[in-house]
Every structure is written in structure tokens, then in C-alpha cells.
């Protein structure tokens, strides 16, 4: 059977994906490996028969797809967060890499490990394929295999070590993933509506209500009388005694009512306005903000937006994306026009336009291929991991360029992300298996494995301690930073599967570009110091 798989790489890839994804769904003590199990299956299969190899372009394409989609999704939050605290995480990542390089130098010297294999082991402990390649570029061709062996020995422990820290730490600290995400504003409370009567001394426009109340709310209706409502145009002035219907979380609405005046008894049934939900599928409005769409001018108000599993109160800068579910308020006679304006077509969502994805991925790969000169007549490349995520972050933040919408529908985003990750893990697992099997015959191989594992665990623990107690991050975001330090998709995939929130993704995307470039430099510096 193994010889058959070795002779048929495509079938081998399919089998590894099927078995790995099946094992990844098995939960043991509340923990499942998810897509990371594909790596283990690939490593085991190729260790049993080193001739089982997936072509390199398969995992290169998979990694590029995965990190590009991560970048697209995290782009808007990345630049917003960087202005507030992202620079702190970037500075921490630089300090961490310098410290880990020093630790690796001490351990390699203490255990008498070879310079090439030791630098490769360091790259493997941080799962940096570009870092390992950069070390190979500095070496004599006759010894170029040493970093590859060191990398292969440390790589499996690097993946499992970070996952182990994340799993054990979450259990010991009794982490409530949902509550942590809620406190960070990534999980919203159920939204409600109530009537508010504006009190004396409150002045401004309806659009000023969030600022005046200090709460994230939106007014959707002006109550003229119990049976006559009209749309709450944000430009209209407010005045004492005006009655409005506002939307928001329970706490936000109650606090807003207390700040603006008092609650009034209001009913939304049997009025001249009704509400309905539509799905955004019109490519002409995707990637545009609520302010750009000017819904009031089109005869409706957007009361709520459901993005994935999260329902939010929109503001003027909220961007509409494919597959968002929008709750609108409008006159009954205008609902058909509103439906056409938003799209509301499941067929349109199924016909995913992959042209923007292909353009963005191509730009990322081209960016990764640009040589960056370094001291010592060496050259650095962002590669097929760094280039696409940088391009994704930029394009994701732009949302839209002319007629091109960079964002993908939610389900397409998740599908491409999972497929890319699985392809990467299957390919890199089989490529490491051959060297792994050969190296296991040498007792010193276990020293390389142990030292690499120690560096990985140290990195994750430092991220946890500094992240939670110094940078005041939640556990999941700290582990996202740890995953970003290793730039390993398997770890972030595990975190996403276990937490069900975007906290880990936020930390991962913030530090990924710095870690990607920093590790290449760190591996080269370590080799030169040895």
C-alpha cells in the first residue's frame, strides 16, 4: 500500500487529507487537533516510506492560500489595532526573537551541536522554512543538508509543543474563551430595541446619539404617534420630547436611555414601517461603508448586521461584506427595491468571483519573490508565506479598489483557508519525514529534538506570561501571538478550532509579518555567531 502511495502522489495527498481531517475531528478530553492532525499523518506515512512525497508546489500554494485569506480577514483590524497597541506587540516580538536567538546559541554551545544543524534546528523550533533556507544559502554546498536535518528533527516538536502549551494552559487557567472574546468586543450580546424620549438639554442630530450617550447604538425610527413611524435620518436635529426607536445591546440601550432622557412605551407592529432581513450579495455595494451607501436616501435604515455568527450595531464606517445578513427598516412598498439593492441572492453568493482572490494571491507571491539585500552579500525573500499575508493585510484593509472587492464571502473564506492549510500540512509533513527517519538512527538526534522542543515551549510560555501580565492580553490572543512567533498555520488552526473566536487570529496577524522577517534574520545571525 505504501509503495502504491509513493508511486501516486495525488492519491497519497488525498488519503493523507482524508485520514488527517478525520482524526482531527476526534475529541479527547475536550481537545481535538483539527487540521493539525494532517501534519502528523503525513509525517508518519513518509517516515514509514520516505518515497512518499507531495510535490513542493502543493504545500507552497497551500501556505500562500491560507496566509492570504488570514491577511484579508484580519486586514481591517490589523491596521486599527496597530495604531493602538500593535506597535507594542511588534516591539515584544523583536525582543522575543533576540532572546530566543541568545538562548539557542547557549544551548547549541552547551550540547556541542553542529553550527549548520543547530541553526536548522533553531529554524525548525520556530517552524521557519525561509529561515532554514537562509541558513542553507550561507553554507558550503557540501554541508547544505545539515540545516535541513536539524529543521526536520525540531519541526514536529515545535508544532506539538505550542499546541501542548495552549491546551494545558487553557485547562489550568480555566479560560472562558467566549467571555474573553466578549470583553474584547469580538462577541456581541443579543441586540434589542427600545423607545427613548429625548430629555431637556440634549442637542445635536440623530447621528450624534452614539456620541451623546457614549454607547454603540443606532436610531432607526422616529415615532410620530403610535401608528406613524418614519425613518430616523441621521442628519435630522433632535429636540426635547422627540421619541425614537434605538437598537443595541441590552446594556447599551439602557445606558443610552438613561443618558438621553427616559424610556417610552413604543410598539413597532401596525405601523407604516416594517423590518426584514436580507443577505448582501450585490457586488456593487460590497466593500462600501454604510455612509457611502446612504441607506436613508434609498428609503431604508440598517438596524443590525450579522457577520458570520456575530450580530453588530452598524455605524457610518461599518463595511458591508459578502454574505452579511442585514436587518433593515423600511416602508412595506419599498422592501422589494431594498432587496434588489442589497442583492439577497444565495445563487450570487454561490457564484464566487475568484478573480480578486487570484489577483491578490498573485500580488502576494510577486511580493514574496522580491529580493531584499542584507549585509554580508546575502538576500532575503518574504517567500510564499510572508508575501501573501502582507498583501492580504493591505488589500483587506482597503476592502475595495475601484470595481474590485477584495473580501470573500464568509463560507468561501473558510473553505479556502481550510483547504490551503491542509495542503500545506500534508506537503511539509511528507517532506520532513524522510530526513526524520534517517536522523532517528543517530542518538544525538534526540538532543536536537529536545533542544528544539525546549526553545519552542520557552517561546510559547514567554508569550503567555508577557502577553497576559505585561501587555494585558487575553489567553487566546497571547497564544495567537505565540502562533505568530512560529508563523505556523497548524497552531493557529488548532486555536481557532478550540476557541471558536477571533482573538487568536488578531494576535497572530499582528505579529506575523514581523516574525516572518525577524526569524530569517535571527537564523542567519545565529549561524554566523556559531
Curated annotation (Swiss-Prot):
InterPro entries assigned to the protein according to its UniProt record, in alphabetical order: AAE_transporter (IPR050144), RCK_C (IPR006037), RCK_C_sf (IPR036721), Transaldolase_AS (IPR018225), YidE_YbjL (IPR006512)
Domain of life: Bacteria
Compartment(s) where it occurs, according to its Swiss-Prot or TrEMBL record: Cell membrane
The entry's keywords: Cell membrane, Membrane, Transmembrane, Transmembrane helix, Transport
Domain RCK C-terminal positions: 260-344
GO annotation, cellular component aspect: plasma membrane
One Gene Ontology term of the molecular function aspect: monoatomic cation transmembrane transporter activity
UniProt-listed Pfam families: Asp-Al_Ex (PF06826), TrkA_C (PF02080)
PROSITE patterns named in the record: RCK_C (PS51202)
Membrane topology designation: Multi-pass membrane protein
Extent of the signal sequence: none
A single BP term in Gene Ontology: carbohydrate metabolic process
Transmembrane segments: 4-23, 28-47, 57-79, 91-113, 148-170, 352-374, 379-398, 419-441, 451-473
Entry keyword Transmembrane helix: yes
Protein family (similarity comment): Belongs to the AAE transporter (TC 2.A.81) family.
PANTHER family (UniProt xref): K(+)_H(+) ANTIPORTER SUBUNIT KHTT, TRANSPORT PROTEIN YIDE-RELATED
Protein name according to UniProt: Uncharacterized transporter CE0595
Organism: Corynebacterium efficiens (strain DSM 44549 / YS-314 / AJ 12310 / JCM 11189 / NBRC 100395)
Amino acid at each position: 500500500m505504501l509503495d502504491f502511495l509513493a508511486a501516486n502522489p495525488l492519491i497519497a495527498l488525498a488519503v493523507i487529507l482524508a485520514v488527517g481531517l478525520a482524526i482531527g475531528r476526534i475529541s479527547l478530553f475536550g481537545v481535538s487537533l483539527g487540521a493539525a492532525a494532517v501534519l502528523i499523518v503525513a509525517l508518519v506515512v513518509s517516515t514509514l516510506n520516505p518515497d512518499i512525497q507531495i510535490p513542493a508546489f502543493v504545500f507552497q500554494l497551500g501556505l500562500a492560500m491560507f496566509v492570504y485569506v488570514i491577511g484579508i480577514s484580519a486586514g481591517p483590524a490589523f491596521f486599527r489595532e496597530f495604531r493602538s497597541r500593535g506597535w507594542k506587540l511588534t516591539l515584544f516580538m523583536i525582543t522575543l526573537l533576540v532572546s530566543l536567538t541568545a538562548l539557542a546559541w547557549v544551548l547549541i554551545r552547551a550540547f556541542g551541536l553542529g553550527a549548520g544543524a543547530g541553526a536548522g534546528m533553531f529554524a525548525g523550533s520556530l517552524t521557519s522554512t525561509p529561515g532554514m533556507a537562509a541558513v542553507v544559502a550561507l553554507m558550503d554546498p557540501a554541508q547544505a543538508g545539515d540545516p535541513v536535518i536539524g529543521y526536520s528533527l525540531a519541526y514536529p516538536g515545535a508544532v506539538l509543543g505550542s499546541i501542548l502549551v495552549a491546551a494545558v494552559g487553557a485547562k489550568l487557567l480555566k479560560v472562558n474563551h467566549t467571555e474573553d472574546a466578549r470583553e474584547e468586543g469580538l462577541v456581541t450580546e443579543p441586540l434589542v430595541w427600545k423607545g427613548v424620549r429625548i430629555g431637556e438639554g440634549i442637542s445635536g442630530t440623530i447621528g450624534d446619539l452614539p456620541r451623546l450617550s457614549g454607547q454603540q447604538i443606532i436610531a432607526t425610527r422616529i415615532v410620530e404617534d403610535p401608528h406613524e413611524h418614519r425613518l430616523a435620518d441621521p442628519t435630522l436635529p433632535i429636540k426635547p420630547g422627540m421619541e425614537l426607536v434605538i437598537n443595541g445591546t441590552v446594556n447599551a440601550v439602557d445606558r443610552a436611555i438613561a443618558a438621553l432622557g427616559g424610556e417610552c412605551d413604543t410598539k413597532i407592529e401596525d405601523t407604516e414601517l416594517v423590518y426584514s432581513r436580507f443577505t448582501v450579495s450585490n457586488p456593487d455595494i460590497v466593500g462600501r461603508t454604510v455612509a457611502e451607501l446612504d441607506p436613508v436616501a434609498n428609503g431604508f435604515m440598517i438596524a443590525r448586521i450579522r457577520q458570520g455568527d456575530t450580530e453588530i450595531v452598524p455605524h457610518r464606517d461599518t463595511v458591508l461584506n459578502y454574505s452579511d445578513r442585514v436587518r433593515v427598516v423600511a416602508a412595506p412598498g419599498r422592501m422589494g427595491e431594498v432587496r434588489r439593492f442589497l442583492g439577497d441572492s444565495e445563487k450570487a453568493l454561490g457564484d464566487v468571483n475568484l478573480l480578486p482572490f487570484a489577483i491578490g494571491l498573485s500580488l502576494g507571491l510577486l511580493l514574496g519573490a522580491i529580493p531584499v539585500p542584507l549585509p554580508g552579500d546575502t538576500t532575503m525573500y518574504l517567500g510564499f508565506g510572508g508575501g501573501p499575508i502582507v498583501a492580504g493585510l493591505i488589500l483587506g484593509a482597503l476592502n475595495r479598489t475601484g470595481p474590485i472587492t477584495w473580501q470573500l464571502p464568509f463560507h468561501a473564506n473558510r473553505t479556502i483557508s481550510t483547504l490551503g492549510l491542509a495542503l500545506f500540512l500534508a506537503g511539509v509533513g511528507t517532506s520532513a519525514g524522510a530526513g526524520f527517519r534517517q536522523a532517528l538512527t543517530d542518538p544525538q538526534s534526540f538532543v536536537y529534538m529536545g533542544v528544539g522542543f525546549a526553545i519552542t515551549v520557552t517561546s510559547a510560555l514567554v508569550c503567555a506570561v508577557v502577553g497576559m501580565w505585561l501587555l494585558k492580553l487575553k489567553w487566546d490572543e497571547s497564544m495567537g501571538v505565540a502562533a505568530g512567533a512560529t508563523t505556523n498555520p497548524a497552531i493557529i488552526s488548532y486555536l481557532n478550532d478550540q476557541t471558536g473566536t477571533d482573538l487568536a487570529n488578531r494576535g497572530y496577524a499582528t505579529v506575523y509579518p514581523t516574525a516572518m522577517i525577524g526569524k530569517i534574520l535571527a537564523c542567519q545571525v545565529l549561524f554566523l555567531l556559531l
